[in-house]
């Protein structure tokens, strides 16, 4: 295989390598989204919201909540977290939850409850970049396209 042609193909199709890598690591992306929510942060790096009931906040913290005292983490029963998904279609990545409370929570706290802030993007990139490199290596080794 001609190295120049291979490199040109990679350059022209880098989006495909990246999207395939995101599909391959979508479960880890979902996990990173949950990790971000557990500390009570939204996609902008701000707190999701504040709990209005101080006693409830103390009970949540006593149960092992990771978020700072009084910060919303969107976790009560765990159903909302369990239903979080990451879906890649074409060049669009959707992170959401199939739980029935999703619309209510988005209206209350904003659609920015989904999506990674800069800190958690870095955490996810630590997973994603090696996968992109792996796909490129496979292509260079045996012509396996994403």
Q: Whereabouts are the PLM-identified features?
A:
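Short, Lys/Arg-rich flexible segments
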Residues: 1-146
């Amino acid at each position: 295989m001609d190295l120049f042609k291979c490199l040109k193909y990679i350059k022209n199709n880098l989006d495909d390598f990246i999207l395939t890598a995101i599909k391959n690591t979508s479960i880890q992306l979902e996990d990173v989204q949950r990790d971000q929510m557990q500390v009570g942060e939204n996609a902008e790096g701000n707190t999701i919201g504040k709990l209005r009931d101080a006693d409830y906040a103390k009970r949540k913290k006593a149960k092992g909540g990771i978020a700072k005292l009084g910060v919303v983490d969107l976790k009560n029963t765990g159903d909302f977290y369990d239903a979080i998904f990451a879906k890649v279609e074409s060049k669009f990545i959707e992170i959401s939850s199939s739980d029935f409370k999703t619309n209510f929570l988005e209206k209350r706290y904003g659609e920015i409850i989904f999506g990674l802030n800069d800190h958690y993007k870095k955490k996810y990139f630590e997973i994603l970049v090696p996968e992109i490199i792996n796909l490129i290596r496979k292509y260079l080794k045996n012509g396996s396209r994403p």
